[in-house]
Every structure is written in C-alpha cells, then in structure tokens.
From Swiss-Prot:
Protein name as annotated: Ephrin type-B receptor 6
Encoding gene per record: EPHB6
Domain SAM intervals: 947-1011
Transmembrane segments: 598-618
Motif window: PDZ-binding: 1018-1020
Length: 1020
C-alpha cells in the first residue's frame, strides 16, 4: 500500500507542476507573484523542523518522469495507542517577507480517507491546521518555545476536497503509507491531489514562519509555495505607476499608488470648474495584485500629442501645433503661419502677419488693411461730409476701423507731401461727427473749418493688428477747403420784458457776420425739461417775443445767425423766468380777479376730484395689471395652460405675498416646542385656530431676528411660491405673518419628518407596493408642478415630508441649490455641466429619489467623493438596484437617468407606470426588452472589509442590522460559517420577520458565502 501511495502521489505531482506554470503564466498578465518560498520540484533535502521528532517524515517520491521530488508525510493513525491524540508539527525555515504586506500560501497535498485505514474511534482526521508566526530574527538552534501554541496565529483548518482510499488497508504508518517502491509508478492512478490557497497578514516584521499541525490524519504535503501579490508597473493614461505591493488587509482593501506623468505630460485639471495644475493621478492595487479604480490621469502638454495609445506624448512635427494641454492630436498651422520647430504650442506668423492679443492660437494670422480708396467730400456751409470706399485688402480681419487726421496748411499743398513744415494740426475748433478715431462707417462730418483755408484730411485704415506692425497705418489723403464761412456765434442775449406767459428778448449781431445776415434762429426750452425738448422760432430782426410759456418757470435761450453760407453756431445759454401768476393778477381789475379766482378754484376742485378718481382706478388697474403681466410671462394663449407666478418679478415682494398667501392674525397662533432649525430660523410646532374654524396643528418657521431685508424677501418669496399650489402631495401653506415681528410662515404639520430619515428609521418594514405608492405620490406632485412650468431644482428624499397617514408631500419649493457641488448626487448631467434646470432635470432627480426610497434612505453613490460621483456620471455609470428592489422599478430608474434629457419620461408617464404596477404587481418583476433601452454600466457598492469583522455581531453592525445581535447570540450563531448556512426558512425562527430585513440579510449572507467560498473555510 505504501508503494502504491507513493506512485500515485508522484503521478499527481508531475501534473500539478505543469499546471502551476500555466496558471502562473496566465495570471501574470494581471498580477505579479513574488515567490517567498517554493518546494515545488525540490529534490534535495528541505530540512524543515518537526516536533515531535518523527511526527512528520521528509521522503522522496517519483514523478511520472521518474524524477524524485521531496514531500513531507504524516500517517500515525493506526499506530497510536487507543485514546491518545496526535499533535505533530512541521515548521518551515525563516521566510523573509521582502516588503510583502500579506503572504499567500498555495498547498498541494493528499489525504487518505479514514474509512480506508481501518481505524475505529475519533482519532482519525482528514484535516490539518495551518499557522504562521512573525519574527524579526530567525530562531536560535536550541529554541524549543516555538512550539507553544500561543505564539502561533491560526490561518485556517485545511480540509481535503477529495481523499483517496488505500489499496491495502494493512498499512497505515507514515513510512508504509507513502513509501516509494520500484512498482509505485504503476499504482498511482488512485492518488487524489488537493490544491488549497490561503493568505495571512498584515505582515509587519522582518519575516515569518509557517507551521502545519497534524492531529491524526494520513496525509502527504507535496508542495508548498509562499508568495505575495504585487501589482506590476504599468503605463496608463499617460502616467507611469510603480510596482506596488498588495494591501496587507487583503480582500477588497486597496493600496493607492501615485503615478508620475510621462515625459511632456501634466496632471489633468481638478474639480468641476477645471483648476489648472491638478493632483497627480492615482491607481489602486487590490488584494489580488490587480490594478483598479483609477482617479485622475495625465494629459499631453501643449505642443505634444498622444503616442502609442495613452502611453507617451510625442512632439508635434514641424508644421503642426497644439495650443492647449489635452489628448487631442496636433493640428496643421493656421493660414499664414508656420511652426519651424517641433513641439510648437503655437504657430508663429509669417513676416508681415500678426495675431492680436484677443486672437486664439487657432486663429489665422492677419495683416493690416490697405489704404482707403476714392476719397471725396461734399461742402455743407462751413462743414463738409468726407466719404471714402473700403480698402482693397482687409488683412483677413473683420474689425476694420478708420481714423481721420486733419492738417491746416498755408498755401496749396499736395496730399502726398504731408505739407512739409508749412502744415500743422488743425485747431481745436475743428470737430468731427460722430468722432475722429475708431470710425466704423466710411464717412465723417468735419465742422468748424474756416473759409478759404486749405486743409489736408487723411483717412487711416486700421484693424486689430495694426499696432503690431512696425509700419504706420496705410492712409489716403485729400485737399479740402470751404469757399464761404458762416457767421460767428451771437455773443449775448438780453431780456427786454416778461409776463406770466411770455418773455421778449433781443441780441446783437455776431462779431463776424461773414456776409449778409438773412435771419436769426431762437431756441428755447423749459429748464425742468430735457434740452432735447426745445422749441425754435425764426426772426428777421434781432428781437423776438416767446409766448405760451408757463407762469413762474425758468427758460433757457440760445440764438444763432444765418447767412447764405448757412447757420452759424449757437451762442451761450442764458436763463430768464416768467412772472408768477399772482403778480399778474394784481395788475387786473378787482372784479376780473374775483372771476378768474372763482374759475381757477372750481377748476382746482374738479382737478383734485379727477386726480383722486384716477388714482383709485390706476391703483386697482396696477394691481390687476401687475398680476396679469406676471401671468402672461408663463401663459400660452388658447392652450389652457396653468399659470405660475414668480414672486421675484414683483417690484414689491410684499405685494406678491399679499396676493398669493393668506395673512394670519398672530392672536390665532399658539407656539409650542421647537422641532428643528431651518435655513431662516427655528421651526416650531404650534396650533392655529382662526375664528369660526377648528384648531389644527401647524409647523411654524420664524425668521431670525435682525435678518437683512434681502433675507426677508427670500423668506417671504418662498412662501409666495408655496401658496400658489394646491395638491394632496404638496406641502400646504396655511398662512403667513407679515404685519408683525417676527415674520412667520405656517404650513401643515408633517408628523414623520423628511422621507429619507423616516425610511432609515423603519428599514425593511414596508412591502414593495407600499414603497411604490410613496413614489407615486411624489410623481403626482411633480406632474402637477410641471403643468405650471415650475422646476423644483432640489428634489430629493430629504425635500419630501411624510405625515402620520404615510402620505408623502413635496416641500422646499423655491429653494435654489447653493454652490456648484450642492445636491451633485441628485443633479442631471446638464445641470452639472451648464447649470441648466428643467423639468427633465427634475425627472433625473426623481430617479435618484426612487433609488433612495427602495434602499431605505441609503446615501446615493454611498461614500464616493463628489469628484468620483462626477466621473462616474460622465462615464455613464448608473446606480445598481438596491437589495430587494424589483427589476421593473430599477428599469424605470434607468429610464429617468438617460443622458439625453429628451429621452427621459415625463412625470405623467411615470405616474401611469406606478398606477400599472399597483394594479398589476407582477409588472414589478418585469425585466423589459433589453433592446428597448441603451445598456448602461452599473456601479457596485463598496464591499465590506471582512478581515476587519471578527464576529457575526460586528458583521450585523456593519450592515445596519445590529438589532438582531441578541437573536444571533441566543441561537448560538457565533461563527461566520454558522451564519453562512442560514436560509430564508431559518429567519422567522430567529425573530426576523420583516420582509425588508429578510431581503437585506439574505443579500449580505450571499456576499458572506462568496467571501467564505474564496477562503475555502465553509461548505455552502
């Protein structure tokens, strides 16, 4: 039997050695195994320490190539006296950990079935135990304390998946059971070789020992391989990540590795807004030596483009450029530019061409314009209108402007000569309309020119790059002069006489008439009016009387003269006042004064009455008009659309409150205990009992004392928004207090508070249909709000309140998110990117609310950071179904999370879908047609860190079901193996009767089974 066992073992060893190399070759693509110890194929004596001596035997067996390999064997079952137990130890040499934080061990062994050994009683085992012990230095040769069990840490009890029977039941000692004989090779077919892998850590000391304890088995330890997992060095996203040891905690724990950007690359920008100079990229190494969870990355610098995928950045070739950092390829140089050197961030312009400071690097280079063409002018008295045509060459730009240079010369000059030393800049009296520089049209009115004086007018063409050119602007010039000159200004105006409704004025002739004066033009205006409301009259003499003036008013007067050459300039302004009405009446007969006084008194009375009537009518009309104008902003005539009024459009927000909310007398309010604190002040429970009505419980929010006026307007404005809506699933406004302090807003009292905290406190207590009914109520409220074109902007489970009848009501209407990252977990992609809130973005937020409801108030995206949430949304990852969530509901969530907002369902469609689920509950389990919607990747929640959980009680606390810790202890569920055996039928006996808790517990039991299956410590 010993010969047969050895032959069978050798045959299995040969096959497993080959398989090991294949497995290592495949897995090395993803992870590196750094070998710390390996006895596979060892032929010389290994010499591990055994205790007691002879408990384990080191022997050689033949493989199928007739080569010896060393094994350790223990088989003392049959030879042991009855009633005595076996305790045989085998210890490895000191193993250097070499930086490993966690060690993995792979065992190849074979175990004989106790039934084949003919041993009765409980002394036979088919298992052995694995231990490890850390040490800073190897043990001294005479050390015996290493066998004390307290110094060792148990890794696991190793059980064989397959044990094999003995071909001869007469031998069960170690030497007989595993002896190598000349005929062994032909007797190895029945030998069963097991492979088990375990890990232990974290390792903190220089090295460690591994020990194997046999307590009565007949086994052969064929090969022992100790190794650690290492994530290989990798190039990814233009960053190099070093070889990184896996975490010592194992499992789902991660070790962050900081990457280094490859040459000519830089970290990507941080945050939503894109801050330059971002954080270095990070990649995480998991416990199995595999890279995962990339955070950030690098991008090629300006002048460099991606090469070899995302492994390197290479310089842009000559003639190409890249202006900004990123992973886009280089681009050909724009027109009239060229990059003579590689790695160009911008293409320099060719000679004679330029880029303005406002031009982007991708803009073509441009040049200054050529000179204007075909200058000509039209004389208009002492002024002239100068015209020209556009330049033949605009330089490739559209920002063409013109400047006019005026020179006054002595004698006849040629435009091209510039006048030499006989020309000078024009006098200040010469003016240009509309202006002298920066003209956009090809004409200008030049005034203030003297007659018979030669001028040179030069028109320059300029654009955005003219200042960059070393040459002066291209210009065209023309000689001009006027043959006639208008009169100079009238120097002064005198008052001759005045009355209550008229003034008579006179003036002298201009100092320089420059010809015969044909007439004068008098301009006058009331000082209380704008000068643009002036009147004119013409007089052929130097005297004029202005009539139909108002008594006691001050008027301004100006006069100008006209000759055949045209009007001269106006003189300076002078002011005269008409007589008051009282002074005029004193010169009239007494009777006439009485008549006029009576008439004026009657007129005054009638005027006062008319003003009073008009004021009342206007005020009423203003109220109605203001209200109507607000409505018209949101109406579509003829379509029967409901209206919503934005209180911020009122000039006086208090007017909006008076029209849209009901004022409550504070005497009817009884304030009780504080139930919370809002953004404006304390929220209290109270009672409201208006006269003639029954008492009702209300929530009262009072504004903080001393709040700024803007805060008061915001506080009342939100109440004005809420007061416009009447729906059973929208929080009802009971009234406001604005005529006394403090300002107060009264709403119906919602006993159970926000929906998210309500669900967290009652996890697992509702059926799926009850949760659907809650969501249906919120959807109905949002359908009602969308019919008013109202966008909520901050919809979440926290903004929904629950009353004692489990009715959900939408609240926080008119609350705008504060800051770019506020409510990011509920925000649609277009809101994050552009701040664009629509009813479609409310649909997205409602889908997140659905997920919150089905997960009993779980935080969306769990503990992911804001940046990780943003990256996940941009990469089109979506939340997975919560535990126990019916497939039909999760499909509805995915519909609300369509990236294209036009493809998201409307709220009326969501209400119809919920109604169908309530009428036909089997539709909750419908998976839908996979082709009807795009496939979306689902996020996975962060897994439990099982190595950190030392008991089922800690596990229950980690999954939020610590209320059942006493139940587990009472029924003796003290190990994870016991918990892993639980099924749905066992839960009621444990006192777990809530359907939601049962679903959650079974979900985590499945995860526990997967973990234990990987560890190989339980049969599930």
């Amino acid at each position: 039997m010993a010969t047969e066992g050895a032959a069978q073992l050798g045959n299995r060893v040969a096959g497993m050695v080959c398989s090991l190399w294949v497995l290592l070759l495949v897995s090395s693509v993803l992870a590196l195994e750094e070998v710390l110890l390996d006895t596979t194929g060892e032929t010389s004596e290994i010499g591990w320490l055994t205790y007691p001596p002879g408990g384990w035997d080191e022997v050689s067996v033949l493989d199928d190539q007739r080569r010896l390999t060393r094994t350790f064997e223990a088989c003392h079952v049959a030879g042991a006296p009855p009633g005595t137990g076996q305790d045989n130890w085998l210890q490895t040499h000191f193993v250097e950990r070499r930086g490993a934080q966690r060690a993995h061990i792979r065992l190849h062994f074979s175990v004989r079935a106790c039934s084949s050994l003919g041993v009765s009683g409980g002394t036979c085992r088919e298992t052995f135990t694995l231990y490890y012990r850390q040490a800073e230095e190897p043990d001294s040769p005479d050390s015996v304390s290493s066998w004390h069990l307290k110094r060792w840490t148990k890794v696991d009890t190793i059980a064989a998946d397959e044990s094999f029977p003995s071909s001869s039941s007469s031998s069960s000692s170690s030497s007989a059971a595993w002896a190598v004989g000349p005929h062994g090779a032909g007797q190895r077919a029945g030998l069963q070789l097991n492979v088990k892998e375990r890990s232990f850590g974290p390792l903190t000391q220089r090295g460690f020992y591994v020990a194997f304890q046999d307590t009565g088995a007949c086994l052969a330890l064929v090969a022992v391989r100790l190794f650690s997992y290492t994530c290989p060095a990798v190039l990814r996203s233009f960053a190099s990540f070093p070889e990184t040891q896996a975490s010592g905690a194992g499992g789902a724990s991660l070790v962050a590795a900081v990457g280094t950007c490859v040459a000519h690359a830089e970290p990507e920008e941080d945050g939503v807004g894109g801050q330059a100079g971002g954080s270095p990229p990070r990649l995480h190494c998991n416990g199995e030596g595999k890279w995962m969870v990339a955070v950030g990355g690098c991008r090629c610098q300006p002048g460099y483009q991606p090469a070899r995928g995302d492994k390197a950045c290479q310089a842009c070739p000559r003639g190409l450029y890249k202006a900004s950092a990123g992973n886009a390829p280089c681009s050909p140089c724009p027109a009239r530019s060229h990059a003579a050197n590689p790695a160009a961030p911008v293409c320099p312009c060719l000679e004679g061409f330029y880029r303005a400071s406002s031009d982007p690097p991708e803009a073509p280079c441009t040049g200054p314009p050529s000179a204007p063409q075909e200058l000509w002018f039209e004389v208009q008295g002492s002024a002239l209108m100068l015209h020209w045509r556009l330049p033949r060459e605009l330089g490739g730009r559209g920002d063409l402007l013109f400047n006019v240079v005026c020179k006054e010369c002595e004698g006849r000059q040629e435009p091209a000569s510039g006048g030499g030393g006989t020309c000078r800049r024009c006098r200040d009296e010469v003016h240009f309309d509309p202006r002298q520089r920066g003209l956009t049209e090809s004409r200008v009115l030049v005034g203030g020119l003297r007659a018979h004086v030669p001028y040179i007018l030069e028109v320059q063409a300029v654009n955005g790059v003219s200042e960059l050119s070393p040459d002066p602007p291209q210009a065209a010039a023309i000689n001009v002069s006027t043959s006639h000159e208008v009169p100079s200004a009238v120097p002064v105006v005198h008052q001759v006489s005045r009355a209550s409704n008229s003034i008579t004025v006179s003036w002298p002739q201009p100092d320089q008439t420059n010809g015969n004066i044909l007439d004068y033009q008098l301009r006058y205006y009331d000082q209380v009016e704008d000068e643009s409301h002036s009147f004119t009259l013409t007089s052929e003499t130097n005297t004029a009387t202005v009539t139909q003036l108002s008594p006691g008013h001050i008027y301004g007067f100006q006069v100008r003269a006209r000759t055949a050459a045209g009007h001269g300039p106006y003189g300076g302004k002078v002011y005269f006042q008409t007589l008051p009405q009282g002074e005029l009446s004193s010169q009239l007969p007494e009777r006439l004064s009485l008549v006029i006084g009576s008439i004026l008194g009657a007129l005054a009375f009638l005027l006062l009455a008319a003003i009073t009537v008009l004021a009342v009518v206007f005020q009423r009309k203003r109220r109605g008009t203001g209200y109507t104008e607000q409505l018209q902003q949101y109406s579509s005539p003829g379509l029967g659309v409901k209206y919503y009024i934005d209180p911020s459009t009122y000039e006086d927000p208090c007017q909006a409150i008076r029209e849209l909310a009901r004022e409550v007398d504070p005497a009817y309010i009884k304030i009780e205990e504080v139930i919370g604190t809002g953004s404006f002040g304390e929220v209290r429970r109270g009672r409201l009992q208006p006269r003639g009505r029954r008492e009702q419980t209300v929530a009262i929010q009072a504004l903080w004392a001393g709040g700024a006026e803007s805060l008061q307007m915001t506080f009342l404005g939100r109440a004005a928004v809420l007061g416009q809506f009447q729906h059973p699933n929208i929080l009802r406004l009971e009234g406001v207090v604005t005529k006394s302090r403090p300002l107060m807003v009264l709403t119906e009292f919602m006993e159970l508070g926000p929906l998210d905290s309500f669900l967290r406190q009652r996890e697992g207590q509702f059926s799926s249909l009850q949760l659907v009914a809650m969501q249906r109520g919120v959807a109905a409220a949002m359908q009602y709000l969308s019919s008013f074109a109202f966008v909520h902007r901050s919809l979440s489970a926290h903004s929904v309140l629950v009353n004692s009848h489990l009715v959900c009501k939408v609240a926080r209407l008119g609350h705008s998110p504060q800051g770019p990252s506020c409510l990011l977990r509920w925000a649609a992609p277009e809101v994050i990117a552009h701040g664009k809130h629509t009813t479609s973005s409310d649909v997205w937020s409602f889908g997140i609310l659905m997920w919150e409801v089905m997960s009993y108030g779980e935080r969306p995206y769990w503990d992911m950071s804001e940046q990780e949430v943003l990256n996940a949304i941009e990469q089109e990852f979506r939340l997975p179904p919560p535990p126990g969530c019916p497939p039909g509901l999760h499909l509805l969530m995915l519909d609300t999370w369509q990236k294209d907002r036009a493809r998201r369902p409307h709220f009326d469609q969501l209400v119809a879908a919920f109604d169908k689920m309530i009428r036909k509950p089997d539709t909750l389990q419908a998976c839908g047609d996979p082709g009807e919607r795009p496939s979306q990747a689902l996020l996975t929640p962060v897994a439990l860190d099982f190595p950190c959980l030392d008991s089922p009680q800690a596990w229950l606390s980690a999954i939020g079901l610590e209320c059942y810790q006493d139940n587990f202890s009472k029924f003796g569920l003290c190990t994870f193996s016991d918990v892993a055996q639980l099924s749905l039928e066992d839960l009621p006996a444990l006192g777990i009767t809530l359907a939601g808790h049962q679903k959650k517990l079974l979900h985590h039991i499945q995860l526990l089974q997967q973990h234990l299956r990987q560890q190989g410590s339980v049969e599930v």
